[in-house]
Amino acid sequence: MATIHVDGKALEVDGADNLLQACLSLGLDIPYFCWHPALGSVGACRQCAVKQYTDENDTRGRIVMSCMTPATDNTWISIEDDESKAFRASVVEWLMTNHPHDCPVCEEGGHCHLQDMTVMTGHNERRYRFTKRTHQNQELGPFIAHEMNRCIACYRCVRFYKDYAGGTDLGVYGAHDNVYFGRVEDGTLESEFSGNLTEVCPTGVFTDKTHSERYNRKWDMQFSPSICHGCSSGCNISPGERYGELRRIENRYNGSVNQYFLCDRGRFGYGYVNRTDRPRQPLLVDGQVKLSLDEALDKAADLLRGRNIVGIGSPRASLESNYALRELVGAEHFYSGIEAGELERVRLILKVLNDSPLPIPTLRDIEDHDAIFVLGEDLTQTAARMALGLRQAVKGKAEDMAAAMKVQPWLDAAVKNIGQHELNPLFIASLAETRLDDIAEECVHAAPDDLARIGFAVAHALDASAPAVEGLDSEALELAQRIADALLAAKRPLIISGSSLGSTALIEAAANIAKALKLRDKQGSISLIVPEANSMGLAMFGGDSVDAALQAVISGKADAIVVLENDLYRRVDAKIVDAALSAAKVVIVADHQKTPTSDRAHLVLPAASFAEGDGTLVSQEGRAQRFFQVFDPTYLDASILVHEGWRWLHALRATLLNKPVDWTQLDHVTEACAGSTAQLAGIVNAAPSASFRIKGLKLAREPLRYSGRTAMRANISVHEPRTSQDIDTAFSFSMEGYSGSAEPRQQVPFAWSPGWNSPQAWNKFQDEVGGHLRAGDPGTRLIESQGDGLSWFSSVPRAFSPERGTWQVVPFFHLFGSDETSSLAAPVQERIPQAYVAVAKSEADRLGVNDGALLSLSIGGETLTLPLRISEELGAGLVALPAGLPGIPPALFGKSVDGLQEAAQ
């Protein structure tokens, strides 16, 4: 710690910070543009000027840039000094000379860091009366709109896009006061994190194009704290609603998880909530008859009464909804909704993490590891936010080199200059090339079994008591030794694997490496990726596979199916699903999307999406987190009968048993769920209960300046009804209630503090800028390392050796396309590739075909005809298909192709 003196006051700060960060952490306001808590200091904008004095006797001082000046002990500065204030005002003025001053039509208005800083400096008069510099804007794809005339040349965009996120197609061109930030030519931004430009940019140069079509100012939207459902990472988001539609998603700061950034799937994949083909009323018999709520419950009870029911849950539904389904059908008749092989792998992951001697890192903690081995995962496609964390982890080498030279880590340009191209070691063992290969020390591409063999060999190289791998060639043995040496040389090694390739051996190999590292006294970590938002929660919760449920119906053991938020056709072979649905006398589906499964239902109950309901998810880290309802859809349209899955299913159970409804609010079902399973006991601590108040007030979902509430329903009736009442949570559907940053709280619907309207308002909620929330980060961990409970896994697979004329089908994952719900969003659909088949260059040469040629594949009697994509790194004997894309049956993965040839034209 250090003592600094600010305008005559002695204050304790972290001496490792710069003055800007230290003062912001104290709650003091200093305007800035180019600095960002995650990007460090470059001193480009000159906006954060303060007066620094030699000591208490110095009355003259000198102007310094606070972002470039360390907060050393006994530093004397003034923020309110007249010369400093005049300097800061002049900086804003010359930055604004070429700005169009188009706030009324700019989509950043009310959300704009430039507005905040201009007001903060007191600049309120334009003296420049000459021609302004102008630029041509670019078309940057379906996610980002571009308006270069608003640019103030802070360089944040390229520093994030290129330096932080590793993008290569956004740059800066020109010189002096005529620079251009964009692509070489029009085209879609290729980075999976391009959407963060909308928050990183302090002006309106890069804005959310998906929001443009239904635009509202930030102060006119209703928000809630929520959790991204796009993958298992558990990123925190702030969805914004107006007129019963989601309008945009912003990043919600969680110092342990996503911090300041989201991937583009999580930011732009919300469009499925607004689809017009969603079920919004109960639908009977092929969707031809709409029912009231009571009619639907009575009809469902009549259909199920006297039946042998199976309940099929879902890893994209909340724990509460899955628990309500289990209570409806009984524990012995509840099935997880996960395919058998996938369920085996997720259960194995849970066992490994429960028994592992190494802890599970948070997404933030991943950035602090200094040697990483990724085994079998294409992280950019399966856990993109973790991939972004790895990009920061490898840069730790440069920070270490800078520290040895007494250079602070926040001096971004100096650290890069010292580090040059030195990186911490990252080893990637994957099917084929990945988006992280550019920062990897070594990459190896092979079949899943061969990747697992390398993993087992690494464990044996770390500790000789680990099972050895028979028949491994010298090249693979040498690679395994190099990986082991790098992990041993590190202070904090990290092993990452997961379930995406359908291989239990990969997970077991990763577990062996973790055990071996602990035996060598290494303070490392292990992270294992599961496929969906609540896969980990379902593994803890229990329930057999969806395959077992369907077989129970086909065999006649059950004659009724209740499906919760699950499209069975995305899980198992369509023939098996067809057989089960045909055999069932009753099929009831509760879902928020129209799916092939709901099309076969006798009754569809309209379930709430994450925007219309509350619930709890468990991330791959084992962190239980609550998502909260953003809006009440019935307020604007009373005909909408959308409710959380748990509400429908509990009410159905009450109707069947002729009992009153016991769970009248979320806390009731959450507490019951927590009491049902030992490992889920902590979910009650994931968020405050409905009784939580600050100064006696509920928490406001709407900003204080929210306008038009009395007119929103005027087209329906001039009589304004009471606002919706939220009995489930501590939030109100109103601007009435507590908002702001003065009182610490974990669950923050939107970032705002007096004078701070942009995402930089998160500074006011943190214990220190870039740290954790003052009330603690949201969520509670359900898995913590309890010591070494693992035994060696000894089932080392044999080397991959396909029979001549056969190929193994393996999955290629896509950030845009492999996920079910985000793929229903129109902007995301523009980024989804056409279905294809990928083979190695050697295979294509043997077949005599070029990229784009149509290939015919025969797989177990089924024939697919798909365009060819040649993969330079895919191994011989493998055929890759894009997982989750239309026309690619999920049951094909892991099977053998027994016919591969150019299709007849």
UniProtKB/Swiss-Prot annotation:
Disulfide bonds: none annotated. Its EC number is 7.1.1.-. InterPro entries: 2Fe-2S_ferredoxin-like_sf, 2Fe-2S_ferredoxin-type, Asp_de-COase-like_dom_sf, Mopterin_OxRdtase, Mopterin_OxRdtase_4Fe-4S_dom, NADH_UbQ_OxRdtase_75kDa_su_CS, NADH_UbQ_OxRdtase_ferredoxin, NADH_UbQ_OxRdtase_Gsu. The keyword Acyltransferase does not apply. [4Fe-4S] cluster 3 binds at C228, C231, C235, C263. Its cofactor is [2Fe-2S] cluster; [4Fe-4S] cluster. One of its GO terms (molecular function) is 2 iron, 2 sulfur cluster binding. Pfam families: Fer2_4, Fer4_Nqo3, Molybdop_Fe4S4, Molybdopterin, NADH-G_4Fe-4S_3. [4Fe-4S] cluster 1 binds at H99, C103, C106, C112. Binds 1 [2Fe-2S] cluster per subunit. Binds 3 [4Fe-4S] clusters per subunit. Residues 83-122 form the 4Fe-4S His(Cys)3-ligated-type domain. Belongs to the complex I 75 kDa subunit family. NCBIfam families: NuoG. NDH-1 shuttles electrons from NADH, via FMN and iron-sulfur (Fe-S) centers, to quinones in the respiratory chain. The immediate electron acceptor for the enzyme in this species is believed to be ubiquinone. Couples the redox reaction to proton translocation (for every two electrons transferred, four hydrogen ions are translocated across the cytoplasmic membrane), and thus conserves the redox energy in a proton gradient. This is NADH-quinone oxidoreductase subunit G. It comes from Pseudomonas syringae pv. tomato (strain ATCC BAA-871 / DC3000). The lineage of its organism: Bacteria, Pseudomonadati, Pseudomonadota, Gammaproteobacteria, Pseudomonadales. The gene is nuoG.
